[in-house]
């Protein structure tokens, strides 16, 4: 599994304070731009991409529709993403497919999409249908993060991931059952076929997220 570490600066000073040496163990850096005001994203972007030079970067605006911090209408959302993507060519671009379906066609020019679905309330009964639709679009990555309320939720996420990966071997999946119960899904990629996991430096970006150092230790034990 590749470890993705989110960074969530709220201003330029916090960008400049990021210790790049602490990111050394990360395989990919996710810039969570929703911690900034919309009009500050392009101002801060040059410093972010300079800091992350040499690392793969996922550009993410997690909106309030899926548990994030920025409230953007459909066109605002796609416009900011396209501006950053065009100017700075991040390795991956997160797109909240179900929340912004009406503007998805405007993103088809980008082959590096992470089509994501987030549900902080539950593991929905139509999980398989959601995963099937996202997979059918053949993005760079299918990402699904749902809240685990029961042990069965955790097992379901792992089983569904294993099934979809076995049928779509070339597709990259990143599946997470959030919360304390779901921690196992964050390190079980060797079994399930989930290819990415998310870990924190300091502040977590989702419930149940483990530290970068602990995640690396667990993966080394399980994968070697």
Swiss-Prot record:
Q: Where is the signal peptide?
A: none
UniProt-listed GO biological process terms: 3,4-dihydroxybenzoate biosynthetic process; amino acid biosynthetic process; aromatic amino acid family biosynthetic process; chorismate biosynthetic process
Q: So what EC number does this one have?
A: 4.2.1.10
Residues engaged in binding 3-dehydroquinate: 30-32, 62, 186, 205, 209
Gene3D superfamilies documented for this protein: Aldolase class I
According to its UniProt record, which reaction does this protein catalyse? 3-dehydroquinate = 3-dehydroshikimate + H2O
Which SUPFAM superfamilies does the record cross-reference, listed alphabetically? Aldolase (SSF51569)
The UniProt keywords, alphabetically, are: Amino-acid biosynthesis, Aromatic amino acid biosynthesis, Lyase, Schiff base
Q: In which pathway does it act?
A: Metabolic intermediate biosynthesis; chorismate biosynthesis; chorismate from D-erythrose 4-phosphate and phosphoenolpyruvate: step 3/7
Q: Cite the InterPro entries for this sequence.
A: Aldolase_TIM, DHquinase_I, Type-I_3-dehydroquinase
Q: Which GO terms describe its molecular function?
A: 3-dehydroquinate dehydratase activity
Q: Which residues form the active site?
A: 118, 143
Which HAMAP family does its entry note? AroD
Q: What functional role does this protein have?
A: Involved in the third step of the chorismate pathway, which leads to the biosynthesis of aromatic amino acids. Catalyzes the cis-dehydration of 3-dehydroquinate (DHQ) and introduces the first double bond of the aromatic ring to yield 3-dehydroshikimate.
Q: What is said about its interaction partners and assembly?
A: Homodimer.
Q: Which family does it belong to?
A: Belongs to the type-I 3-dehydroquinase family.
> Which protein are we looking at?
3-dehydroquinate dehydratase
